[in-house]
């Protein structure tokens, strides 16, 4: 049984030769996009022997139109990041390199964070995971739900 068959069979509730294994890690900022991201993930995959690749997304959402979000009204000024932004394309290039290298032998799962966590963790203009209770975004939602939800 190969890795793809093992994972798909386990998900479907069928018998497997062994329980599929998967674990992942966050890589340094220098390995967050492009070829460096692909190389870090592929090296980890090959050294660990996991049954699938989980691609991390350690890239902050770029705050277009402002530097940081301090007040609920700031959310109204936030603009979508262009689909063809350099950072986004570099990340997708890294994902493609991973798929090209191992997509035939293992399933590849790409991390997509939910909007609530993304908004909370990016209010400072860079990734900041210190607000584990989501107090900042929750306070903004309570104070001005329309402005916050519009983002």
Show where each model-derived region lies:
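Active-site-proximal, glycine-rich beta->alpha crossover segments in alpha/beta enzymes
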Residues: 65-151
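N-terminal basic, low-complexity leaders that serve as flexible interaction/assembly modules and, when applicable
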Residues: 1-70, 93, 97, 103
């Amino acid at each position: 049984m190969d890795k793809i068959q093992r994972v798909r069979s386990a998900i479907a509730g069928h018998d497997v030769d062994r329980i599929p294994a998967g674990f992942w890690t966050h890589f340094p900022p220098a390995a967050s996009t492009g070829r460096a991201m692909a190389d870090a993930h592929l090296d980890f995959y090959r050294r660990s022997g996991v049954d699938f690749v989980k691609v991390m997304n350690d890239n902050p959402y770029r705050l277009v139109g402002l530097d940081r979000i301090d007040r609920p009204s700031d959310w109204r000024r936030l603009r979508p990041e262009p689909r063809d932004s350099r950072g986004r394309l570099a990340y997708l290039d890294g994902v493609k390199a991973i798929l090209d290298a191992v997509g035939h032998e293992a399933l590849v799962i790409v991390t997509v964070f939910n909007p609530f966590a993304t908004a909370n963790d990016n209010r400072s203009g860079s990734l900041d995971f210190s607000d584990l209770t989501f107090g900042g975004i929750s306070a903004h939602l309570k104070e001005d739900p329309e402005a916050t939800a519009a983002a």
